[in-house]
Structures are given as C-alpha cells and as structure tokens.
Amino acid sequence: MQGGEPVSTMKVSESEGKLEGQATAVTPNKNSSCGGGISSSSSSRGGSAKGWQYSDHMENVYGYLMKYTNLVTGWQYRFFVLNNEAGLLEYFVNEQSRNQKPRGTLQLAGAVISPSDEDSHTFTVNAASGEQYKLRATDAKERQHWVSRLQICTQHHTEAIGKNNPPLKSRSFSLASSSNSPISQRRPSQNAISFFNVGHSKLQSLSKRTNLPPDHLVEVREMMSHAEGQQRDLIRRIECLPTSGHLSSLDQDLLMLKATSMATMNCLNDCFHILQLQHASHQKGSLPSGTTIEWLEPKISLSNHYKNGADQPFATDQSKPVAVPEEQPVAESGLLAREPEEINADDEIEDTCDHKEDDLGAVEEQRSVILHLLSQLKLGMDLTRVVLPTFILEKRSLLEMYADFMSHPDLFIAITNGATAEDRMIRFVEYYLTSFHEGRKGAIAKKPYNPIIGETFHCSWKMPKSEVASSVFSSSSTQGVTNHAPLSGESLTQVGSDCYTVRFVAEQVSHHPPVSGFYAECTERKMCVNAHVWTKSKFLGMSIGVTMVGEGILSLLEHGEEYTFSLPCAYARSILTVPWVELGGKVSVNCAKTGYSASITFHTKPFYGGKLHRVTAEVKHNITNTVVCRVQGEWNSVLEFTYSNGETKYVDLTKLAVTKKRVRPLEKQDPFESRRLWKNVTDSLRESEIDKATEHKHTLEERQRTEERHRTETGTPWKTKYFIKEGDGWVYHKPLWKIIPTTQPAE
C-alpha cells in the first residue's frame, strides 16, 4: 500500500475524550475503486482518498478509525476491518498487527448502527450482546461510508438468522458477571438470538417445552401491541408541545427519543418475525396436510398511524376534516367512464399557472418529520408503499412532469428535418439532453405527486414552422433545410397552418408497481414517441434513489426509423440537511435500421471533489465504429457539442426558450385529470398550508385504496383508458403508426 501526504497534528483531550484536531482516516476497498492508501508512523497518519460511489453491494472495508476507550485514555486510533462474510467488525492496534488475533470483535447480526446527532463524525455500533463501540471518522463523508457498509452487512446477517440458520440452543448468562468481566465484554455473541434469553426465566422455561401450543406467540403479540400503544402516546405528547420555549417539540433530545423509540419497535418487530420463522421450521414436519400458517402481526401497524411523521388530524374525533368539494366521492368515482375520450384542442389555452418552485433549502423545521421517517426505513428498502412527507412535494403530478420534458417542441420536431441518418441521431441526442432541465425544474429537491391509478394528463404545444426551420440547433450539415413539402395525408388545415401541433397524453396505468404511460405526436411531421416508465424508489441511507425502469420509442414515419431510449436514475441527496437532486447512470439510444447509437452517462458527484450534474455522451456509427459527435457539460447549465467536422457548439440551457404548453381550463377537465384531481393539494401548497395539503392528499390516497379493495373483493380487473398492455410494455391505443403508413425512403 502506498503512503499519502502528511496531515496536521492530532490532539486528543484525555479529560473529555474529544478530538480537538483533525486527521485523515481512509477506508479503502479491496473490491472497488473506492479506496485509498494508508501509511502510519509514530507521529502522524496520512492517507489519500478517491471519490466513493455509493453501492448497495456488500464489500469488505478496512482502515483507521478513532475508538473511544474510557475517560482516562480517551480516543485512540485503531485499525478496523469489516468482514462481511463472517458478519464481524474487528479491530487491531495498528495495521501491522492485522495478521494477529484481533484486539476486539463485534458480531453484527442483530446490531444497530447509529450515527451521532451531536456531530457529523461520530457513530456507534451496538451489538446484540450489549457491547458497544463508539467510533469517530475523519469527516462526515467517511462516516457515511462506514455506516452504509455496516448497515448493509448487519441487515444481511440479521435476515440470515431467521431464513437460513436452524434453531440454536438457548444460552443464559449472568447479567452481573457479563457486565463486569472484561473477558465477557470482549467475547462476541455466538448468535444474536441467544441474547434474547438473557435473564428471562420465563423464556428459558418456554424453550424447554417440547410441544408448544399453536398460539404461544399470541401473548408476545399482545405485549408488542401494548408497547406500540405506549410509544404512540409518547410521540403524540412530544408533538403536542409548542415549537418554541423552554421545552419544545423540536428539542434535540426529544427528537432523538422519538427516533430511538421507533427504531426499537422496528427491532422488536424483526425479532418477532424471527421467532415466527423458527417456530414454523419446528412445526413444518408435523403439520397435517392442508394446514396453513398465518403470521401474527401486531394489531395496529405503526406505518398506518404515522404517514407524515405524526398522527393525522382527521383520525380523531376532535378534528374535522377540511371539505374537499372538487374531489370525487368514492361511490361516484368508481363509475367514471373508462372509454377513451377525444380531447377538443379548441378548448385548450396557453398555460397561465405559475410553476415556480422554491428549493427546500435547510430542513431544520421539518427535522422531526424526517427523523421519524428515517427511523422506519432500512437500507435498500423499497419506498413504493411509503408515504413521504407533504412538504417535499412539487405542485404538479408526475404525469405533468413527463409532459414538461417536451417543453422544447421545436427541437423535437427538428429531429425529422435531419437530412441524413447521422444528423437525425445527433438531433435526437440534442433534444434528449436539453429536455431534463425543464422536466426536473433545474435541480429542485422536490418530488411530484404520485399519480392515482387512472389519472390522466392532456396538453399540446403550438410551434411556428419558421422557428423550427431556423432552429439554432441545426448542425452545419442542415443549415439549409427549409420548410418541408406537404406530406401525403395532411389535411388542408394543417398544410395551410403556420404552426405545427404536438399533442401529449399520459395515464397512470398501474398502482403497484407504479407505471406511467405517455405518448406524444406531431401528425404534420409524421412522428410520435411512446414510453412507459416504472418509478422504483429505494432508501440509500442519507439519500433516496429512483430508478426509471422502462423505455421509450421515437418513430419517424417519414424515414421508417425507430429510436429506442431509456431514462436515467434520480437521486435525492443530503435529506437530513440541505437536500439536493442529481441524475445518474448510463442510458442508451439505438436505431436498428441506420446502425447509429448513442451512449449517454449522467455522472453522480463523488464524495470528494468533482462537479455537480455532469453529463457526457458519444454518438457512434456502429458499422464503422466511428464517433460522429461528443457531448460534455451539465444537464441543467451549459452543454458542449463537438461534431466530427470539427465544429463546436455551446448550448446555455438557462437561456433556452421554453414553449408554454396548452391545457384546458379546470372546469372542462375530467375529474381524473391531474390538475383537477390534485387541485386542493396544489392550492394548499401554494398557500403554504402543509397540514391542509396533507389532508387532501390522504383523502385521494384513501379513495384509491378503497377502490382497490373493492376491485379485489369483486374480482374486477382494472381497465385502462388510453394505453394497452403489449408484452412487458404499454402502448397508446391509437398510435400514429397505425393511422399513417410508414414511408420507406430510397437510400
């Protein structure tokens, strides 16, 4: 291993056990590039670190951390090794003694990893045996790296206890001897389940019974339900406190108490589940045929009572829900027509709504809500069914966000104006990369509404033909392209019009999983795009990742070409401090007919250095393996296009004109169209009335759940309105390629 640069002297206060200086600690990784070198000497420690990219794979991590020993000795550097295969956290006096017996070992199965709320460097590892390591990293980023790796390893081995391990013999220890003996403190627990029997004679007697009654876990369930009720009362009393004063609901100790109590209940639920699995493995061979096993869940689910970090006001008799006149009653909404409806374009007017969004900034005021939410989540957990707090919402639906990706219709229409297959692929990449800054509103750290199943959104754009012909995005090979000759099949109205029309429709076709379908077309230019997207969200520790599963197909019927493309992932970072959003991942664009393809990479910011929102791309002719265009820059700022002829073009997205979409007034929209459906939520958010917005949002979600239960009970399948399922995807019911025949131009 190579040494790094020397760093500043470190000073440790023995009386207080606090780090007063700063040193560099590195956690290299054997299996990835996320590593660094470590060197040590008697006087200083140095290191070099590369940017860590988050991964949810299990990795062996090792490096120096500071370990708090006691008030006399204080903090000391120790060399730590995370052994994922064995599920152990080991430490040594230094790196040179790594081949010797470890100085200490913690079993991670059943452990709890807790970042400190006092500073951004410290964290604790609490083993199921009761032993605790208090550790300190060099900075917040290094701490997050260690915490993430430890949590992944802990979750893996905790789940393995119930799934893979056979029941072990219970062992009981003397609490007095185990707590006072240094040897017993250092000895790792052989299995996390053994700790659950410490000092509990009642459980010991139960373990000796050979034939347990089928309902022996009912008492445990009742005790857990009672504990959950007390925990809910605790949180309710804390949140009833004023937000300011001597004792407030935002007091740091109370916030930590809330988060810790919720985490404790989650751990107990995990333990209860393990007991059920163990009991099932005992009874599996002796059950008569046809017998079914039902899990004994607590009577009241915590998640049902704390959707947004507190009890919902409408759940009590003391509070009256706000009237929602525009929202459709349950009985009536279930009878809405599901047949496709033709939208009258004459009813559409230019959008006048103010869509300006303020960034979240620091979230100190909502810290209690976020801490409560985080206490319910596990690393890698699917967030599809998790209700996120209302204050992070944009004032638009996800379906409208997809429409906003079309806010440059001039660039979209200009794709088919390309004189060659190469030019058309480059134009598509130019359009694709310029669509995100408006679709994502720059990089605002908010999320759109999750669409209700059956929700739709309609709009259109009018684009003067002269602006498309003189588009500044035309490359040098197409500068002379003018308005095309009338296409066969175009109506006299379309030929005589000075504007192209791009029409857009989107529909939420599925609720679980959440899948949206959207379709846009320009009939005059014989082009359309059809896409389906499944938004799959995941909890990543201090960030949330959203994978856009699915694909889109752009059809240029005039040229007989199809361009298949995918979408990048989105990440919400620093959700506890100042949230921000970035895009990440590799996407591809392919045209099978012409042999041209594009590879686009949205780069996530590394922990150390690097730029935000960076994107690079290459357009290649696969047959000759020739790169015809390269792109670099930021997807929400400036893009640089370099063409094969040496020409370079810069596009400042902040100055790029946005064409306003045309929508029908609310009174002419159907009850399930996005803006009318979410009107009360949007109005409340505009007035900064978060509680009222939460109530309206809950009403919509409850209606959706009620209708879903009704369909399940009656065996009625959901019928989509505008999209038809074909294979694994969804296709618009009247795509342009079924109406207008594809032209096969001469090569």
Curated annotation (Swiss-Prot):
Does the record carry Endoplasmic reticulum as a key word? no
Molecular function terms from GO: sterol binding
Alphabetical list of Gene3D superfamilies matching this protein: 1.10.287.2720, 2.40.160.120, 3.30.70.3490, Pleckstrin-homology domain (PH domain)/Phosphotyrosine-binding domain (PTB)
PTM Phosphoserine: list the residues.
15, 172, 174, 177, 181, 184, 189
Q: Alphabetically, which GO biological process terms does the record hold?
A: fat cell differentiation; lipid transport; triglyceride homeostasis
Gene Ontology CC annotations of this record: cytosol; Golgi apparatus; late endosome membrane; membrane; nucleoplasm
Q: Which residues carry this modification: Phosphothreonine?
A: 27
**Limits of the PH domain:** 58-155
Where along the chain is composition biased (Low complexity)? 170-184
Tell me the residues on which Phosphotyrosine occurs: 62
Biased composition range(s): Basic and acidic residues: 689-713
Tissue specificity: Present at highest levels in ovary, testis, kidney, liver, stomach, brain, and adipose tissue. Strong expression (at protein level) in epithelial cells of kidney tubules, testicular tubules, caecum, and skin. Present at low levels in subcutaneous and visceral adipose tissue (at protein level).
Question: Do you know which Pfam families this protein is assigned to?
Answer: Oxysterol_BP (PF01237), PH (PF00169)
Primary location recorded for the protein, binned into one broad class? membrane
Q: Which InterPro entries match?
A: OSBP_sf (IPR037239), Oxysterol-bd (IPR000648), Oxysterol-bd_CS (IPR018494), PH-like_dom_sf (IPR011993), PH_domain (IPR001849)
Q: Where is this region: Disordered?
A: 1-50, 158-188, 689-714
Concerning SMART domains, the annotation shows: PH
Reaction(s) catalysed (UniProt annotation): a 1,2-diacyl-sn-glycero-3-phospho-(1D-myo-inositol 4-phosphate)(out) + a 1,2-diacyl-sn-glycero-3-phospho-L-serine(in) = a 1,2-diacyl-sn-glycero-3-phospho-(1D-myo-inositol 4-phosphate)(in) + a 1,2-diacyl-sn-glycero-3-phospho-L-serine(out)
Origin: domain of life: Eukaryota
Domain comment text? The PH domain binds phosphoinositides.
Its biological purpose? Plays a role in regulating ADIPOQ and FABP4 levels in differentiating adipocytes and is also involved in regulation of adipocyte triglyceride storage. Weakly binds 25-hydroxycholesterol. Interacts with OSBPL9 to function as lipid transfer proteins.
The Swiss-Prot or TrEMBL record describes its family as follows: Belongs to the OSBP family.
Record protein name field: Oxysterol-binding protein-related protein 11
